């Protein structure tokens, strides 16, 4: 209700049927929050109708029309001309007004007991009239239905839908979608002397419409001793697919100390104001430092370090008495 000092009324469209071409028959139900006896009413009609009849008289002592018995709870059926919107599927109900006239004519004799505010007023439909602050200037929302009631064999439309929820004469519509991320991690490691040692860790998590996999493989062939340990973790966020793989292979015949740390960070953000839009941000920083030291029992030794800022670390250490050939 956009007007002050007027009894609050609600209106709903209870049924719609397609007649022909752009003509539809609609039924509306109007109800007030309080009852007003019929004796106070002089005239009640629907005006400004875009249809075969521009005025639908429901009650009028001058017109001798008495189609309703309660001005605060009544139903009316009439025809309107309605046209599909730009999508070709939706038809909006044309706007109209319901005009109330209390305490007019011979009903004025009851003025001393009148207690419901303004006595003559119009209540309008629609959601296309706003003031500078965005407040609706109509009293009832707009309604719509499917074009020519397609999909219903009996020629009737699915119950007409309101344009939205109306609160303090403002129509608002909103949709919220949420998603949940579930993560699982599996870790394994092994250490062997005078043999080939392999350790791998794989962590994967899956969220709606997204898969992330990360794997680290470390292998070494030694004549003395080999120790290999690796740990990998990965995370997944909605609507992104990311894959990362790190492989390290070392063959030694001298004394080799190899230490590597690999870290991967994935960050995915979704703009709540953009439908079906995903922004992926990948950040990785790797620094490598190789130092060769002379040793009496080997031509040289090497030290390799790799560091990245993230939530996942991989560390491999190998000590052998051979030559060094690191490959990343």
Swiss-Prot record:
Superkingdom as given in the UniProt entry: Eukaryota
Protein name per its UniProtKB record: Bypass of stop codon protein 1
PANTHER family named in the record: KERATINOCYTE PROLINE-RICH PROTEIN (PTHR48138:SF2), KERATINOCYTE PROLINE-RICH PROTEIN-RELATED (PTHR48138)
Segments of skewed composition (Low complexity): 291-328
Annotated stretches, region: Disordered: 168-259, 286-328
Gene responsible for this protein: BSC1
Additional remarks: Open reading frame exhibits genomic organization compatible with a translational readthrough-dependent mode of expression.
Residues of the Flo11 domain: 1-155
Pfam families: Flo11
């Amino acid at each position: 209700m956009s007007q002050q000092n007027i009894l609050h009324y609600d209106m709903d469209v209870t049924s719609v049927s397609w007649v022909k071409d752009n003509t539809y028959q609609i039924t509306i139900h109007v109800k007030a929050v309080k009852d007003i006896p019929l004796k106070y009413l002089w005239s009640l009609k629907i005006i400004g109708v875009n249809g075969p009849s521009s005025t639908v008289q429901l009650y009028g002592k001058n017109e001798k029309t008495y189609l309703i018995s309660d001005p605060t709870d009544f139903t009316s059926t009439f025809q309107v001309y309605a046209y599909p919107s730009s999508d070709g599927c939706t038809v909006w109900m044309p706007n109209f007004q319901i005009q109330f006239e209390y305490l007019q004519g011979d009903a004025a004799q009851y003025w001393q007991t009148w207690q419901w505010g303004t006595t003559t007023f119009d209540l309008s439909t629609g959601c296309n009239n706003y003031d500078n602050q965005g407040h609706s200037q109509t009293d009832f929302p707009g309604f719509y239905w499917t074009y020519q009631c397609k999909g219903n064999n009996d020629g009737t439309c699915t119950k007409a839908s309101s344009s939205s929820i109306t609160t303090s004469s403002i129509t608002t519509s909103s949709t919220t979608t949420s998603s949940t991320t579930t993560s699982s991690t599996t870790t394994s490691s092994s250490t062997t002397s005078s043999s080939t040692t392999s350790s791998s860790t794989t962590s994967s998590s899956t969220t709606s419409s997204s898969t992330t996999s990360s794997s680290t493989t470390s292998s070494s062939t030694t004549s003395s001793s080999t120790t290999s340990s690796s740990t990998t973790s990965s995370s997944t966020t909605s609507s992104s697919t990311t894959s990362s793989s790190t492989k390290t292979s070392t063959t030694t015949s001298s004394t080799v100390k190899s230490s590597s740390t690999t870290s991967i960070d994935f960050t995915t953000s979704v703009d709540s104001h953009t439908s079906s839009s995903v922004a992926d941000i990948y950040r990785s920083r790797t620094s490598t430092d190789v130092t060769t030291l002379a040793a009496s029992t080997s031509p040289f030794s090497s030290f390799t370090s790799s560091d990245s800022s993230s939530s996942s670390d991989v560390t491999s250490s190998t000590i052998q008495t051979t030559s060094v050939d690191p490959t990343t």
